[in-house]
């Protein structure tokens, strides 16, 4: 076995931005879930369930199964080692994949914003647009509400780090 070639982020402000988004639930439609809700250290960065509970859930790990949240139809993948370049596809159905041509194929298609430079980055954005995971049963105005949340809660240092990602 060879060790994975996982690289630590070069820019600590970018790492702080990722940590900020990972831990905060304001990106979910009803503010009930964050990335950290389902990627728990005590369960090897999964939730410990065969299928997770998304928006509307309460508690962590198996306690979420007792809540009235929405059941998500796929399991939570671990995040350990996923930064290695050998991981070129994500999700069991291959929803996000780095092609031989260097293009990252995903449901975002040609609308993928600039700044996503690997399959893991694209895969990490997928839950944010999934109704059962983050979005919830909102209205057509949900996108505007999310924009307002970002405007209201964005930290200055996080904004600076985000701007470093945009060419």
Named regions from a protein language model:
Residues 1-167:
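Periplasmic c-type cytochrome electron-transfer domains
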